[in-house]
Amino acid sequence: MHYSVLLQESINDLNINPQGIYIDATFGRGGHSKAILNRLTTGRLIAFDKDLDAISYARENFQFSNFEIVHASFASIYDYCLQHSLLGKIDGIIMDLGVSSPQLDNAARGFSFTHNGPLDMRMDVSKGITASQALEELSVYDLSYIFKVYGEERFAKKIALRIKDYIQQNGSIRTTLELAELIRATIGKKEKKNPATRCFQALRIYVNNELKDLEALLENILAVIKSGGRIAAISFHSLEDRIVKQKFSALINPKQELNRITKMLPQDSSQIKLKWITKKSKANEDELNQNVRSRSAILRVVEKL
């Protein structure tokens, strides 16, 4: 079962205009898209996803005249809006970042460290290298960097060395449980979390270019959204959330850091591009009981001035 995290909170905070144009940057299985469509009359929704399974699901289950699904990363939203004369005309954007439940639950996709499957991890299986190929191609230094920066893994170098040594002896790491067991054997079980959690996250982020795609979307988001339009971002780990928070904060108070250092007067209000609608919201107890994966979700919502 796929549950859209923080569904009501995010849709309510978008303050849907029934005649508006909206973008679901991460369609998944359409939970947020369906909720938006239910509030539209003459408005329309454009959804994006890199995953071909999500595209197929949308085409089979979302046959609405005011809905369009685009097989592309959300990093291409600006280009899409430019090509379709939609810059500055979008009433709202929702982004539900990270991996979806169907991707995690399908062992064949290679995202899970508890179900065995090919070590793939690509959200778009039509292109790019698999996680298995990445482990073979990356150096110890690069692999250690990825685990440390993208996974915040304390034992990054130790794990990277063990992986490269294993590959040298065995040729490759082909399955998810093969990698998960190798990580567990390297560092042991030192906490409640599965010891493979951070490295799997890091490898997935690298394979799918997730953080760079997020930065590309946020870099041009002001040109896409109209005045009074809102942006809702749901993140699941500190790296994503930090990027979202810093970008939003920079557009809400562009000279905040400079003011703190130089004691300058507050900036001209014309430099402020956004305002907070929801600075930080987390799942309530009912949602946590229904969906354990919602425990790390953070919702931030802003409005363009």
From Swiss-Prot:
It comes from the Bacteria. Keywords: Cytoplasm, Methyltransferase, rRNA processing, S-adenosyl-L-methionine, Transferase. S-adenosyl-L-methionine binds at G30, G31, H32, D49, F74, D96, Q103. One of its GO terms (biological process) is rRNA base methylation. Its main location: cytoplasm. GO terms for molecular function: rRNA (cytosine-N4-)-methyltransferase activity. It is found in: Cytoplasm. Pfam families: Methyltransf_5 (PF01795). Its EC number is 2.1.1.199. It is an enzyme of class 2 (transferase). One of its GO terms (cellular component) is cytoplasm. InterPro entries: RsmH (IPR002903), SAM-dep_MeTrfase_MraW_recog (IPR023397), SAM-dependent_MTases_sf (IPR029063). Belongs to the methyltransferase superfamily. RsmH family. Specifically methylates the N4 position of cytidine in position 1402 (C1402) of 16S rRNA. This is Ribosomal RNA small subunit methyltransferase H. It comes from Francisella tularensis subsp. holarctica (strain LVS).
